[in-house]
Amino acid sequence: MKEQKRISESLITESLTNDMFWVCLENEDPILGYVSGRIRHSFIHILVKISVSCYDSTRTRRRIIYRLRNKDSND
C-alpha cells in the first residue's frame, strides 16, 4: 500500500550544506528540509511545497518537493 503524505506550502529561511534548508511552516517551529529531484539550488526566502510522511515520528525532517514561483520574480 502506498504511503499517504500531507503537502503544505512553506518558506525557506536559511540554506545549509548538502542541500539542506531551515524551513518555516505556517503554525509550527522551523524544521530541517532536504531537496528532492531537480531542486538543487541554494535559494533563500523562497516558497516551497513540503511533503510530510505519516510515519515520521520526530516530525523534524521534511522533503521539499516543489519550488513555487513568485509573482514578482523574473524566473
From Swiss-Prot:
Q: Which InterPro entries match?
A: NA-bd_OB-fold, TIF_IF1
- Report one GO cellular component: chloroplast
Q: What are the protein's UniProt keywords?
A: Chloroplast, Initiation factor, Plastid, Protein biosynthesis, RNA-binding, rRNA-binding
Its subcellular locations are: Plastid, Chloroplast
Q: Give the molecular function GO annotations.
A: rRNA binding; translation initiation factor activity
Q: Which domain of life is it from?
A: Eukaryota
User: What's the main place this protein lives?
Assistant: plastid
Subunit structure comment from the entry: Component of the 30S ribosomal translation pre-initiation complex which assembles on the 30S ribosome in the order IF-2 and IF-3, IF-1 and N-formylmethionyl-tRNA(fMet); mRNA recruitment can occur at any time during PIC assembly.
By sequence similarity, the record places it as follows: Belongs to the IF-1 family.
Purpose of the protein? One of the essential components for the initiation of protein synthesis. Stabilizes the binding of IF-2 and IF-3 on the 30S subunit to which N-formylmethionyl-tRNA(fMet) subsequently binds. Helps modulate mRNA selection, yielding the 30S pre-initiation complex (PIC). Upon addition of the 50S ribosomal subunit IF-1, IF-2 and IF-3 are released leaving the mature 70S translation initiation complex.
What this protein is called in its record is Translation initiation factor IF-1, chloroplastic
Source organism (scientific name): Cucumis sativus
